[in-house]
């Protein structure tokens, strides 16, 4: 395929046109008075959203050179979303500001490499200062504030803070579509896996069709149990304690299952059997998780253990187990807290190492089950369009809240970026590196300027007053008042602000140091076939 090539100023200018088109589309959504953008969908109703990364991903430009610039900014938004889960619009605004200011200086003869070094030094100083002025987030109210700011809904803030309180910071919080109009929270505490009882005759509550075991022993094995003689010595030991037993095995069949059911019906023994969750290596890992949570040992050939030799020492324990036809929930396992903490640390390190989104999702699920449970926020709305928009907002809020708990919070509304200007301005740099620093100084003002503009105020006036105000005081664009941002609840997670600035500077520097751009030439359209002469159609 033939290529189209542009050099130097022509290359950069074409890319910057694409940057501007995308950024101008996205930045109208910034702040409490930000507008919405309507996205056409190939099927179904249009999507109305103010989520920066969702808008950025939809933009595809006809000009190949402009499209490359737009795609680079879209990459900034996506990367910021992946790291922090929010701040995508801020990242886009910062990228545009750095690129615009940088291009002016490069066109005027400045060295792009020197500018890049200055930008990197200034951003490092800004990030250090952000961490210095950060405040830790703890307590239900503080978490609710962060979530409410990101989602623009106090009710959503309450749901997220309650969910995090119930399942812990590492717990899984999923967002699903509700069948009704109302948004609601549902929490499953303890370790849940999608395997139900092997026989309905094992239920203890015939009305609800569930089996509830109080203070049970738990046998965990990756073997198939077909012969009751294999586990008979262990069953006799458990029977002496007068406590119920949960059996988690590869399968229970043959004579073993009817024997267990018969003893259950006669009232001799309260026992429930379920299949082991997962498949292959993931099954082994999940069984090990259950064993650590309950203080038991997996009976497996990998450890040289056999069912017929199993003793009471291999059994796990928990406060309660609930089993229905589809799922099993283990509540308050008796495992050692330090062993559970070690297991959690191992899973976290595996999550950082993996490059597969699917594997990361499965590891996150395992982490949640060990850490305390799963919460589901069921989103309700009057129309499908409103439902999609609400779901995106709640996802952003959840990610922002997790980021806030992890690294703390700073004043929101772009105020924190203006607060670090003094520290960045104090850097002693020379030549083009000083120019790079000045570019960052100008860019740090841009989010506040855009938020003010979207709300109908003059950004320059707001920024000048903000620079003279104490750290923490800022402009509430929602009502036009000057307030203590943190006290009022206008806050941003440090991780979000930091990621937006770092990713914006990284991609903007790449654009400024670009000297040639190679694009595919569009393929010429194939000529349309001429219509067939009617006289050649045989009179049909």
Curated annotation (Swiss-Prot):
Which reaction equation describes what this protein catalyses?
A: ATP + H2O + a folded polypeptide = ADP + phosphate + an unfolded polypeptide
What molecular function does GO assign, one term? isomerase activity
Q: Which UniProt keywords apply?
A: ATP-binding, Chaperone, Cytoplasm, Isomerase, Nucleotide-binding
Q: Does the record's keyword annotation contain Ribonucleoprotein? A: no
Where would you find this protein in the cell?
A: Cytoplasm
Residues noted as binding ATP in the record, renumbered to the chain: 29-32, 86-90, 413, 476-478, 492
Which leading EC class covers this enzyme? isomerase
Instruction: Give Gene Ontology CC terms.
Output: cytoplasm
Set out the biological process GO terms recorded for this chain's protein: protein refolding
Major subcellular location class: cytoplasm
Signal peptide range equals none
Q: What is its EC number?
A: 5.6.1.7
Report the family membership: Belongs to the chaperonin (HSP60) family.
Listed under subunit, the entry gives:
Forms a cylinder of 14 subunits composed of two heptameric rings stacked back-to-back. Interacts with the co-chaperonin GroES.
Alphabetical list of HAMAP family matching this protein: CH60 (MF_00600)
Q: What's this chain's function?
A: Together with its co-chaperonin GroES, plays an essential role in assisting protein folding. The GroEL-GroES system forms a nano-cage that allows encapsulation of the non-native substrate proteins and provides a physical environment optimized to promote and accelerate protein folding.
Name of this protein: Chaperonin GroEL
The protein's organism comes out as Streptococcus agalactiae serotype V (strain ATCC BAA-611 / 2603 V/R)
């Amino acid at each position: 395929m033939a290529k189209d090539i542009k050099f130097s100023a022509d290359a950069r200018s074409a890319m910057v046109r694409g940057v501007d088109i995308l950024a101008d589309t996205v930045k109208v959504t910034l702040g409490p008075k930000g507008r919405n953008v309507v996205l056409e969908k190939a099927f179904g109703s249009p999507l109305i959203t103010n989520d920066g990364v969702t808008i950025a991903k939809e933009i595809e430009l006809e000009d190949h050179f402009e499209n490359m610039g737009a795609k680079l900014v879209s990459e900034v938004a996506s990367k910021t979303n992946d790291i922090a889960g929010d701040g995508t619009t801020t990242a886009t605004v910062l990228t545009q500001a750095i690129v615009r200011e940088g291009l002016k200086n490069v066109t005027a003869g400045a060295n792009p490499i020197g500018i890049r070094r200055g930008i990197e030094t200034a951003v490092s100083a800004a990030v250090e200062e952000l961490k210095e002025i950060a405040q830790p987030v703890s307590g239900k109210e503080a978490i609710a504030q962060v979530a409410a700011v990101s989602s623009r809904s106090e009710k959503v803030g309450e749901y997220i803070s309650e969910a995090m309180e119930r399942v812990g910071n590492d717990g899984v919080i999923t967002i699903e579509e509700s069948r009704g109009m109302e948004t609601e929270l549902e929490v499953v505490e303890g370790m849940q896996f999608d395997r139900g009882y092997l026989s309905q005759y094992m239920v203890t509550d015939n009305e609800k069709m569930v089996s509830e075991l109080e203070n049970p022993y738990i046998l965990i094995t990756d073997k198939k149990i077909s012969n009751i003689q294999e586990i008979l010595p262990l069953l006799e030991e458990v029977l002496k304690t007068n406590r119920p037993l949960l059996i988690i095995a590869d399968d229970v069949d043959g004579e073993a299952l009817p024997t267990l059911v018969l003893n259950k019906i006669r009232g001799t023994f309260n026992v429930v059997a379920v299949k082991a969750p997962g498949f292959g290596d993931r099954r082994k890992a999940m069984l090990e998780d259950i064993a650590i949570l309950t203080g038991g040992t997996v009976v497996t050939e990998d450890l040289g253990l056999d069912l017929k030799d199993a003793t009471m020492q291999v059994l796990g324990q928990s406060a309660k187990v609930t089993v229905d036809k589809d799922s099993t929930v283990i509540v308050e396992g008796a495992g050692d807290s330090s062993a559970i903490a070690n297991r959690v640390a191992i899973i976290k390190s595996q999550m950082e190492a993996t490059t597969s989104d699917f594997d990361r999702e499965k590891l996150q699920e395992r982490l949640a089950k060990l850490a305390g449970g799963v919460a589901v926020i069921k989103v309700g709305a009057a129309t499908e369009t409103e439902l999609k928009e609400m779901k995106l907002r709640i996802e952003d809020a959840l990610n922002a809240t997790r980021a806030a708990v992890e690294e703390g919070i700073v004043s929101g509304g772009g105020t924190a970026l203006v607060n670090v200007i003094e520290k960045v301005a104090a850097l002693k740099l020379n030549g083009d590196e000083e120019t790079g620093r000045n570019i960052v100084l100008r860019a740090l003002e841009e989010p506040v300027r855009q938020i003010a503009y979207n709300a109908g105020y003059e950004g320059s006036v707001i920024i000048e007053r903000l620079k003279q105000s104490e750290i923490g005081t800022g402009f509430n664009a929602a009502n036009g008042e000057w307030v203590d941002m943190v006290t009022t609840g206008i806050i941003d997670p440090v991780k979000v602000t930091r990621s937006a600035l770092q990713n914006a500077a990284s991609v903007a520097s790449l654009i400024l140091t670009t000297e040639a751009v190679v694009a595919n030439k569009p393929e010429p359209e194939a000529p349309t076939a001429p219509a067939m002469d009617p006289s050649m159609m045989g009179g049909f």
